[in-house]
Amino acid sequence: MESTAGKDPSTKFVVIGLLLGILMSAMDNTIVATAMGTIVADLGSFDKFAWVTASYMVAVMAGMPIYGKLSDMYGRKRFFLFGLIFFLLGSALCGIAQSMNQLILFRVIQGIGGGALLPIAFTIIFDLFPPEKRGKMSGMFGAVFGLSSVLGPLLGALITDSISWHWVFYINVPIGAFSLFFIIRYYKESLEHKKQKIDWGGAVTLVVSIVCLMFALELGGKTYDWGSVQIIGLFTVFAIFFIAFFIVERKAEEPIISFWMFKNRLFATAQILAFLYGGTFIILAVFIPIFVQAVYGSSATSAGFILTPMMLGSVLGSMIGGIFQTKFRFRSLMIVSVISFFIGMLLLGNMTPDTARAWLTVFMLISGFGVGFSFSLLPAASMNNLDPRYRGTANSTNSFLRSFGMTLGVTIFGTIQTNVFSSKLTDSFSGMKGSAGAAAQNMGDPQEIFQAGTRSHIPSAVLNRIIEAMSASITYVFMLALIPIVIAAVTVLFMGKERVKTTQEMEKKTG
């Protein structure tokens, strides 16, 4: 399904349209998370706020593999536009939501569209450009993905503070409108597609299993206890339908996920790395702002700005990884990535309340640089040397596993951080006596340290104990995250000797 657009001057407008789509999709969840406090204060229903994120993520992840396969079968353009229109419709509706129930429903609509944007955009780049140019373009796209993920919290805080939470959603409308125009007007795709049978059995069993798993992970420990009937029931249904999915896929003529791809060593390792990187990178975006706000006493907006060095590092890493794809093996570039990521995480894990913010900036630059490589290299590795009719499936699998890793990482590491914080706080307070001890026992929610006005009224002895407990719990999580990074390092060694071959090299090989 190669497009001729790569030879057309209008290709630059297609690229802009795709970049805008990635910008919205990657930024959406983090930008909304920043505004959730204000949204709850306005709409009420605190007990339902977790569903705002859960409903969107479930819809996105359930759609990713389906869109990837359908784009292979019937073309990229129509499904990218379908996703874009649904995303814009959902965004506009979210902005006018009058209740939490409405917002949750509209987030589902937004998520149905969002699941198409990221995987199909990366796939179109491979269709548009020859091998020697794909690296540069995937580096650019990976940079925008990394930029969007880190920019979300900052932009969300600024919009919520200076305008209103509604514009966290409305901002997508003009961006998406430009993307829609550029893709409709300039993306010329071949209309020659074979009529193929849709794997409805695989689609249904996969969607049901993903929906159950995602709801269990998103709501467990928040809305329901992990041992509750609801969560156990969701995990049980997930297991049943996931097993059914495997059985159905083995017999399907055109399976949603082609498991034969995992026999390719480069493809298989790229999927494992996407999952591991997703699960570890996200904790930096989540916990560094918390560290800055709780330990350093910075404002929410300032905490958002603190991620800028990591953003710059990831952009640089993504661009370098993309540019050198045709010159070095995937394995060699990912070794640089995983070493940088490991060093950065190790340094972050050794921080204390006395660590200067300048050093935090350096540590984030190192971490972001390492992670940035993965944004451009892993999608490219997933689609390397694959026939064009399998690219959508390959890249959607990679995007799905990265997103799944992010969800799992936030859930697991978030639970660990909360438990460690509570344990250390209890131990710390138990040894306090006198007026400070009484103040500690009478204190309400320790999370009050996030609020500047309340923080100033907490006795210094109590405040210092809370800060130390918070710092220790977050750095404990960073040190624990070294485990999946080490697993990633071992996985990288099995990537083989492949690299992106230029057009001339492929012609010489076939000729």
Residue map of PLM features:
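Flexible interhelical linker loops that connect adjacent transmembrane helices
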Residues: 3-8, 180-207, 222, 250-265, ...
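Transmembrane core module of solute transporters
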Residues: 11-64, 68, 144, 164, ...
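A generic transmembrane-helix signature of 12-TM secondary carrier transporters
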Residues: 22, 84, 88-91, 106-107, ...
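Interfacial helix-cap and linker-helix signal at transmembrane-aqueous boundaries
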Residues: 39-40, 70-71, 155-163, 217, ...
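Helix-loop-helix hairpins in multi-pass membrane proteins, especially solute transporters
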Residues: 64-202, 219
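Small-residue-rich alpha-helical segments with characteristic i,i+4
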Residues: 141, 151, 360-438, 493
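C-terminal membrane-cytosol helix-exit motif in multi-pass small-molecule transporters
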Residues: 174-191, 207-219, 237-251, 488-496
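Hydrophobic transmembrane architecture of multi-pass small-molecule transporters
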Residues: 403-494, 502, 508-511
